[in-house]
């Protein structure tokens, strides 16, 4: 969940513009109800963790507006005023396969403040809002990316075209032209988001009537459109692959600027498929909510006045409450409005992308009404919980290792190819599940083995005294399927193959394995992390269930370890199938 620091001075400025007194203590007490967990409130500002579904609260302007409705009962129309503009944006058909969703808007006359500090605060707030939307709704610019430009520096109409890698322009904050290829390879933003341009040989750019590049989405803007402290007229472009995310991003940026007095104008979009339309749309979304659903979820019946008041605090409007005359004769889904039942027609702002079902409206009604005002009653739904079939086996394995003096650990399921295979000399037995856009080189795939995670743990604790004995029972992923494995590792002087065999034998005994069915087979040299002649496969009923042994010093050195280590790893799924539970 994104955590933001909202400056008291900006919030005070926004509330003063609307005749509302800003009280940070009131925010601390009441704002968590609408998805704003207050982490800190100091002299500079208020730090708030925003729930993932409330992306409409990521800027000073939008959260201040929501607070006015929720805390001060200020009523706003769910319809967003958008004036019809005459600027045209034409999208070339080649864009369809590259970045198919293109939306734009114009905002004029934004009040960015009087003093230099107020103007600087505005620019900083706008940039932070843009990046938070990239991170959340935009899914790191994959679903949607936003460009904000100084309109006065541009010459409409605009065109969205595709160019090759040799096309050049001056990117934001640079002094000389760079080609598309150079930007993707050497510019910080280019390197960060180059993966979004994989497997294409044409790249999207937005140009004005003089063929000057405004934007190379989703990477970077052109330098000549840079927004400054004196910018009052804006062009906003949003491009991506998910139309719902793109529309929400565009409306939320427009809303922030409109809250500062800006007038939003639509543009005429001539899309790649030949469709002509005006965007953005400011009209609200209409939802039908059965009265039965409200009563079922809240445990009480609310009258029309109470519903209207509650939804108003969440930015919506109750249009009417009526008896259904046309619809199904029986209820098949919770949200169905049956003939003869009462339903409520509710309008919500289009930028509330988190509202996808009538149950979301019921949640907003509950928040507006106040959870403290709802009746207390025990649930009438009785649910019996039973253990998973595998939980008994997992519990017995952990108990056995703990009884042997091995501390239980839990590590990340994420790992990397070098740790999983190259360092420990295990072959990639099954198809690996890799991360398409890894943040670090250490976490590029989902692990197939657990032992490398334990060796990394011992490496991180190598400065502590010996012995160190650890085990982990966890999830691995092979061929896109979750499986369970257990591994142990002991860093101790004098512990060798005999110690490893002792631990393995004790575990199998505790699980109820028949010793006559257990076979110990020598591991071939360099097949796994073991010293030659000191590694073994454990076979039950002809099936290999695990390997144990003494680690080759060369393998230990790869993990930064300089002490003798004995270890092993078992396939828990195989153990469960081959060793019957002696208790059952």
Where are these regions (language model features)?
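Function-determining surface determinants
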Residues: 47-49
